[in-house]
Amino acid sequence: LWLKERATPCPDAKHAGIAESLRGAWTTLKSLPQFPDFGILTTCGFLYQCGVAVVITLSAVYAAAVMGFTTEDTILMVFLVNITAAAGAFGFGYAQDRLGHKRALMVTLVVWLAMIVVAYFSETRTHFWIAANLAGLAMGSSQSAGRAMVGVFAPEGRQAEFYGLWNLALWLSAVVGPLSYGMITWVTGNDHRLAICATGLFFLLAIVVLVPLNVERGAARAKEMSAREAA
């Protein structure tokens, strides 16, 4: 309470930080052809995070509109999914060490796709509970696997740039995913089942995009560029 702040206020610091972040992201974006595997990963991350954003922001809406969940049901679902997400992140951490980054991410994307299928065909609350817990299992692990590979593909001294572009892609996905869901329900007259089915396309496309990614090649490219920039 008695500590005095001696720093001089800088009103433009926030705007300068945003501008600097955007410039860094643009610089990294222009250099993507030199890092093809990072480009693949960023595209994949954008796609699957579009789907994840839909699940995070609109799962309660789907549960109420399609499955007839009450507010109490939704609160319980969120609570249990958080527990499942913690267990999934812990378990997939070990799986990632054994399978490698790419395979671990591929497994989580398949789980996400399975969740969409179960949610789409759910006719009872039990089926939807299964879908919700599948989402929990995949949620933390898919995000951690992607971020781990960003660190592998980033040259020494440029980690902030690469993570900046990765975070920008995730920010865009948080807008595009829910917006696409909303547009589909609007066009189809509140057909939430069709909207959740369409959300599965994000995960399916992410799997297709991920297939040609080569972690070893991307890591070697990062080391090569680090050595070149240090010379």
Residue ranges and their predicted role:
Residues 103-118:
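Structural signature of the two symmetry-related core transmembrane helices
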Residues 141-155:
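Intracellular juxtamembrane helix-capping segments at the cytosolic ends
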Residues 1-3, 197-231:
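Multi-pass alpha-helical transporter architecture, strongest
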Residues 57-74:
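Short amphipathic helix-loop junctions that connect adjacent transmembrane helices
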Residues 120-132:
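Helix-loop junctions at membrane interfaces in 12-TM secondary transporters
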Residues 5-42, 228-231:
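Juxtamembrane intracellular "pre-TM" segments in multi-pass secondary transporters
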Residues 87-101, 185:
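Helix-to-loop junctions at the C-terminal end of transmembrane segments
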Residues 183-203:
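A membrane-interface helix-boundary motif in multi-pass transporters
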